[in-house]
Amino acid sequence: MSNVTSDATPDTTPDQTPDEQPAAPKTMDILEIMSLLPHRYPFLLIDRVVEMEPRKRIVAIKNITINEPQFQGHFPDYPIMPGVLMVEAIAQAGGALLLSEVPDRKSKLLFFTSIENARFRRPVTPGDQLRIEVTVINWRSRAVKMGGSITVDGKLVCDAVVMCQVVPRPAKKVEDKPEAPQE
């Protein structure tokens, strides 16, 4: 049975107006992710955001394919995703959540400042789809502590606690050009 009234407005509790209904979780495609994160191929490790509750949690997806450069050397006869890249995927998902809340984000960078309790529980191989869930533990000014987990087909493959900090983006340095040789 539907919870929609005849005039197609959602049912509300007596204390709740339609404007106070919780918003649907936000999603992001790859272009929106790229507008937030400075990472690019081959180091952009989230493909899509499927859920996001501002300042609380984010769920992102990463599709693993044999075409990724790490599989050329890790390991050619048994390709598995390096654990450190899974932790980086957790940090990037958390970074997307954090930077989505930062005003003037083009003038900011997000630095990964710590990793705690990282555990790698199962190998990840080409063909797997990572579901990366990150939840805010503590958000203080520019620093955020987040707990992250990655599952494949509902099975936990990695979890870690990460800390990130927003810092001003330094001005680009223009190196002095060497003088042209004198003839």
Set out the residue ranges of the language-model regions.
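Segments adjacent to and within acyl-thioester-processing domains across lipid
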Residues: 2-34, 158-183
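Hydrophobic beta-strand-centered segment that forms part of the acyl-chain substrate-binding groove
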Residues: 3, 24-27, 94-131, 157-159, ...
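Catalytic strand-loop segment that frames the active site of acyl-thioester-processing enzymes
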Residues: 40-81
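Hydrophobic beta-sheet segments that form the core/acyl-binding groove
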Residues: 49, 116-153
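Terminal leader/tail segments of proteins
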Residues: 50, 56-65, 125-133, 158-161, ...
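Compact, glycine-rich, soluble single-domain proteins
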Residues: 65-99, 111-112
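Hydrophobic small-molecule pocket/channel-lining residues, especially in calycin-type beta-barrels
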Residues: 79, 151, 155-157
